[in-house]
Amino acid sequence: MYSIKTDHKLMPRERLIRLGPEKLSNQELLAILLRTGNKEKHVLELSAYLLSSLDSLADLKKFSLQELQRLSGIGKVKAIEIKAMLELADRIQIAGQAVADPVLSSAQVAEKMMIELGDKQQEHLVAIYLDSQNKIIEEKTIFIGTVRKSIAEPREILYYACKNMATSLIVVHNHPSGLTKPSANDYHFTEKIKRSCDYLGLICLDHIIVSKHGYYSFREKSDLF
């Protein structure tokens, strides 16, 4: 259970200024984001209440906007601010993981994409375009929804490859189920995109399936490459 601060003489904002953000508790940091409490709860009590409803801090990402609003004291505005904060934190983490050096392995790409796609509740199909030195030119989300619908036509993947004048590409998609074992459709799609790349003189380096818990690389584990 998160403790509730009883000394309100030095509020979280003042403590952050004096001590730095790393010295504040999760309760205090969340209180700064919430800004105000309500008629029933002081802002520190409200942040403690929200945190006490979680098994771990990471569970905060699992709340939908509607679920946050249903929590006592968390209205629409506060729920929106929390979701925006979580999304921004994700983007900062992703930016920090950006691959500036050459891509050297499927495991390197998989680790990056597990962070980006591991928690997604819908399937995302992403293409990573590389230059002749295996440096990333662009990472493009091609499709969100049901990957099967995108399997029929790899033309959009190839369009951006040509637009970026890429030498090679890596295709990644996630399995929200958490299981990374490829389906028959995944095999069919891999064969199709590889043939299409060969036809255009592009190199398809890999097709990687990721989840929160791991990844499957067709290059590492199948005979398609």
Curated annotation (Swiss-Prot):
Q: Which Pfam families match?
A: RadC (PF04002), UPF0758_N (PF20582)
Query: Which BP terms from GO are recorded?
Result: proteolysis
Coiled coil region boundaries: none
Question: Where does the source fall among the domains of life?
Answer: Bacteria
Where does motif JAMM motif map? Answer: 173-186
| Keyword Calcium carried by entry | no
Which parts of the sequence bind Zn(2+)? 173, 175, 186
Q: Domain MPN spans what residues?
A: 102-224
- Which GO MF term does the entry hold, naming one? metal ion binding
Q: Which UniProt keywords apply?
A: Hydrolase, Metal-binding, Metalloprotease, Protease, Zinc
Q: Which family does it belong to?
A: Belongs to the UPF0758 family.
Annotated protein name in UniProt: UPF0758 protein SZO_09140
Organism the protein comes from: Streptococcus equi subsp. zooepidemicus (strain H70)
